[in-house]
Amino acid sequence: MNEYIRVCPNCGREIKYKWKSDFLKASRKCSICKSCSASKYSIFKIGHHLNDSIVRNNSLDRLYTEISPQTLYWVGFIIADGSFYKNRFELSLSAKDKEHLERFASYISYSNNIVYRKNSNSYRLFFSNKQSIAAIMNYYNINYDKTYNPVNFDSYTHFNKELLLSLLIGIIDGDGSIQSNGSKRANIITITAHKNWKTFYAKLLSTLNIPIHISEVKGTNTITIRIYRREILLYIKHFIINNNLTVLERKWNIIKEN
């Protein structure tokens, strides 16, 4: 007999079902496991089912109701590293970046557990919220399977350059790297993306007056976007400092001012 398995959206434990109908019903309701439903942290309301808990209060609403450089940073970060599937959102980072995941969780007032995955040595947060996820995907023109389906940059032209630079910084922290470029004071930012994102990056960099260096990786569907002028790298780092942005410090500390 087949066994149907899903993950508790609150604690990450596997929940096993004998019958497919029970599995589908629980999936639709985003039900939590028995341990979590019995926990003192669960909140039950009249008219709700037993497993209908506070998990639905998690949302990404702050990312489209409070527009700021920090908000656009996080939007760029989840464009790079976040995952959207139906009414579900997930963000997973390696163990070394757990603190950064906790900062994001704090920013969106995430109330569930951040779950450790031993097989990948990573941490993740995840939740379902039909209204909130639909709203943010619509507001920022984010598509499902976003690796291959880029956002339309024209949907971002109403943002000023400070917000767009914050967006780029978030993308760099999610999909980019910062490395030495041959000498002590020389560095290079490299972003790797599917070739379908070429127009998006070309328009974003052009709007920010950053020289466009985009090349296709031979034999693949991948492009690399490079930023290496020292005055631009220092400007970006000063922008981070002046706006007190929460970023991945291990990356930006590579750029030295002297």
Regions found by a protein language model. Give the residues of each.
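Internal intein/HINT superfamily modules and their associated LAGLIDADG
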Residues: 2-20, 24-258
